[in-house]
Every structure is written in C-alpha cells, then in structure tokens.
Amino acid sequence: MSLSPAIFSIGPVSIHWYSLAYVLGIVFAYWHLHKLDEQKIFTKNFYDSLLTATIIGIILGGRLGFVLIYDPISYINNPIEILKTWKGGMSFHGGAIGVLCAVIISCRRYNIPIFYTLDLISCGVPIGLFLGRIGNFVNGELFGRVTTMPWGMVFPESGDNLLRHPSQLYEAFFEGLLFFAIANSLFFLTRIRLYHGTLTGIAVIWYGTVRFVVEFFREPDYQVGYLWLDLTMGQLLSIFMTLLGIIVYLSALNSKFNTKSVA
C-alpha cells in the first residue's frame, strides 16, 4: 500500500494530508464545541484564546511528547528534524497534555468551568483522532504487525514485503468514529453531562483501553520496542491513562466536579 503523503506541491512547498487532517480536526472540534455549549457561557474571547492555546498545545505537546518519549537521541543528534511535523511523529499522549494545559490556562483566564469545557471537547475530539489516524495511514506510518488476515496490507515503510494489520484504520474507527457516536449519544440522550467530568473520564478510559488493545496489532515503535512484561510504550502510557480516567469518572459521579463547580 503506497499513497503520496502530499496532496499537491507548488515548487518547494507541499501541502500534506497529515497536516490537513490536523487542521480539519481542529476546525471541527471548534465548531462542535460551540454547538454543544448549551449554557452559552463561552465568550468569543474565550473561544479565540482556547483555539490559539489548543493549536500551540497540540503541536508542542504532540511533537515534544514524541521526541522525548520515543526517539530523544535521534533528535538530539539532528534537532532540525523536530520542526518537520509534516513527516509525522506526533505523540497523542503528549498532545493530550498540551490540550489539557491549553484548556486550564484559557478556563482560568476567563473563569470558565474546566471540566464542563473538557466534557464538551471530549465529544468533538474523536473526529480529530479519526482524521489523524487516516493521515497516519496515508503516510504509511504506525503500521501493524505481520498478519495472515485477508485484509492485511503491505506498507513500504516497514522495509519488507509482508502483509500487516492496517492498525491505523482500527484506531481511526474505534478511537474516532465509534467513540464520537458513543460520546455524543451520552451527551444528548442522557443526563450524564450534568456531572462535569464524567464524559472526560469516559473519554480517557475509552482511549486508554482501545489503544492498549490495538497495540497488540500494531508494530512497536522501533526506537523503543518492547518494555516491561513485553508491553509497548503506548500500552504502558495507556494503562496510566485508563487509571486516571477511572479516578476522574468516579470523582465526577461523587459530584466533585458537578454542575455547581465553577472551575
């Protein structure tokens, strides 16, 4: 399976599918956030602040997370490569921390409930994850392990001619499309949204669990390989995420972050 990572090129400038995926994901999340703000507590200034901070958080957090967690030595030896985000190499876990920092900063600045905001963001982010994984698929990166399944694909970036799981598509569906449907169904069809933090907790639990399982079908990052108990770095980070999500969810149900909270 070989697709061009560039949509088109004009001279030395190329527009890449991976970059477009990020842009479309952010635009959709921004629009969806506005749609879900039933209490209409978000002001234009807050939206602008959150959008700017989120873009910075995604890029810095995602890129630095990848560099520091997965391949620090390589980038220390060739630091200019850190800037080449269009080649891929973005860490979801690092990006998530960046977005969390962006939300906290913007909410504190405009006195907006943090977990109310995170709950709404959790309903729109899955589409961004879907688009991002499609970008990974087009780039031919983050491919799966060798398989005999009939839907196995050959990824040139793997350096061999073996059929592999299209693990990017697994993640695109389960982390993206399926959870988008689940999160928005919970938001619109139940009263769970009244307990600020519940949707955030569910989102973190869902991602951590799905990522942990999909990692069994995904080729480990060559820079890190297998770690403790033959688990990958992605799985170890996902275990931490799942535990954190459970804590947030249970705390929300106990009304620690309920509708009476302001931050």
Curated annotation (Swiss-Prot):
Family matches, as Pfam families: LGT
EC class: transferase
Name of the protein in question: Phosphatidylglycerol--prolipoprotein diacylglyceryl transferase
Phylogenetic placement of the source organism: Bacteria, Pseudomonadati, Pseudomonadota, Alphaproteobacteria, Rickettsiales
GO terms for cellular component: plasma membrane
Record's bilayer topology term: Multi-pass membrane protein
Pathway recorded for this protein: Protein modification; lipoprotein biosynthesis (diacylglyceryl transfer)
Family classification: Belongs to the Lgt family.
Disulfide bonds: none
EC number: 2.5.1.145
Keywords annotated in UniProt: Cell membrane, Membrane, Transferase, Transmembrane, Transmembrane helix
